[in-house]
């Protein structure tokens, strides 16, 4: 027996850390993304793009999933993707959406203009401008009478 024994939880964390993807961009519900999905048919493989709005992002670790919705010929199409699946080649974030819900079920009843989501502007990086101690303003001169 080995000197150090791993618990089941430690083994699970170790295996998951090897399989988890690091190249997933930051996005959330309401954002428009393109998922490049690898499809294998017979001996050929090809990449299929699926562009739509993220309706839900759920779970953590290897079991994290997203639901992406798009309208195709007036019919709503939703697809569930496992984020850390090897079938996903890459994910591109096209537009940042401004929503106040984590699960956008109300988009299912809407189509066209009413299904639009406002755009969220990315936060600007605020530069900290600190003046050095020697750059202080000189003290005001005292009034002479």
UniProtKB/Swiss-Prot annotation:
Basic and acidic residues bias: start-end ranges: 112-130
PROSITE patterns: RIBOSOMAL_L19
InterPro entries, per database record: Ribosomal_bL19, Ribosomal_bL19_CS, Ribosomal_bL19_sf, Translation_prot_SH3-like_sf
Domain of life: Bacteria
Spans annotated as Disordered: 112-145
GO CC annotation terms, alphabetical: cytosolic large ribosomal subunit
GO-annotated biological processes: translation
NCBIfam families assigned to the protein according to its UniProt record, in alphabetical order: rplS_bact
Job description of the protein: This protein is located at the 30S-50S ribosomal subunit interface and may play a role in the structure and function of the aminoacyl-tRNA binding site.
Protein name: Large ribosomal subunit protein bL19
One Pfam family in the UniProt entry: Ribosomal_L19
Gene: rplS
Assigned protein family: Belongs to the bacterial ribosomal protein bL19 family.
UniProt cross-references to Gene3D superfamilies, sorted A to Z: 2.30.30.790
GO molecular function annotations of the record: structural constituent of ribosome
Keywords (A to Z) from UniProt: Ribonucleoprotein, Ribosomal protein
């Amino acid at each position: 027996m080995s000197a150090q024994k791993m618990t089941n939880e430690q083994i699970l964390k170790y295996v998951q850390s090897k399989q988890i993807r690091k190249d997933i961009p930051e996005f959330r519900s309401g954002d428009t993304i393109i998922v490049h999905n690898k499809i294998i048919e017979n001996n050929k493989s090809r990449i299929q793009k699926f562009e739509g709005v993220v309706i839900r992002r759920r779970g953590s670790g290897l079991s994290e999933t997203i639901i992406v919705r798009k309208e195709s010929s007036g019919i709503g199409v939703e697809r569930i993707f496992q984020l850390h699946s090897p079938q996903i080649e890459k994910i591109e974030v096209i537009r940042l959406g401004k929503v106040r819900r984590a699960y956008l079920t109300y988009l299912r009843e809407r189509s066209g203009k009413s299904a639009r989501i406002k755009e969220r502007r990315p936060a600007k990086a605020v530069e900290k401008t600190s003046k050095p101690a020697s750059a202080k303003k000189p003290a005001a001169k005292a009034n002479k009478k």
